[in-house]
A protein has these predicted regions:
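N-terminal active-site beta-alpha-beta segment that forms phosphate/nucleotide-binding
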Residues: 2-126
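Conserved phosphate- and dinucleotide-binding cores of soluble alpha/beta proteins
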Residues: 2-5, 92-215
């Protein structure tokens, strides 16, 4: 692996450790206020776009959005719409299964909660009209810092360039730049509690960190 890749990995790890520590320092009350603000902005977006299918995730621990996010989204979607949630595979790629209510979730590895319905396959996310992903940080180019497994980079690579992709953040996690590797995939927008929906169009839709707009 080239030396610059090792440096990027180290820089990512250091940034991730610092930001996750800041998340853990938030009080339960602060997390609840932030979750409510993020949910309200996302619900507004869902009601405006009215997607027939969207994908999201179940926030855990200090992740933005609150652990009731799937129920909030399901209530905001059109009655016949489908909400897909991720199922982590052994190879750290993501499969997708429909969410039908709290009783359709089970505890999974790494502290995750996943749907119990039969998975639809890794490519199911490509049929979503709105994709919501977690992130530890996102920069002004739209490039995200995740947990380090590459799961969502692989998922985002399957999403058509025209589909809106949104990362949920705490305040202070939309940053000027995150360390990147060529496989890193951007998002179109972020939602933060204070700023709401923010477009981050510095990387062309469908691009990776190795191909930025104008290059």
């Amino acid at each position: 692996m080239p030396e610059f890749s090792d440096e990027a990995h180290d820089a990512k790890r250091e940034m991730r450790i610092a930001l996750l520590a800041a998340r853990r320092s938030l009080s339960a009350a602060d997390r609840a206020v932030a979750a409510a603000a993020v949910q309200a902005e996302l619900v507004t977006l869902v009601r405006r776009l009215r997607p027939a299918r969207m994908s999201a995730y179940v926030p855990v621990a200090s992740e933005p959005g609150g652990d009731d996010l799937p129920d909030v989204l399901r209530a905001a979607l059109p009655p016949d719409a489908e909400l897909l949630l991720p199922v982590l595979r052994d190879d750290l790629d993501l499969d997708w299964a429909p969410y039908t209510g709290p009783e359709s979730l089970r505890a999974a590895g790494r502290g995750l909660r996943e749907p119990t319905a039969p998975p639809r396959g890794r490519a199911a996310v490509a049929g979503a009209a709105l994709v919501v992903v977690p992130a530890v940080a996102v920069d002004r180019r739209g490039l995200r810092l995740g947990r380090g497994g590459g799961s969502y980079d692989r998922a985002l690579a399957r999403v058509p360039a025209t589909v809106p992709t949104v990362a949920l953040l705490h305040d202070g996690e939309l940053v000027e730049a995150v360390p990147t590797l060529p496989h890193d995939r951007p998002v179109h927008c972020v939602i933060t509690p204070a700023d709401g929906l923010v477009a981050v169009p510095g990387v062309g839709p469908g691009a990776s960190a190795g191909r930025t707009r104008g290059s």
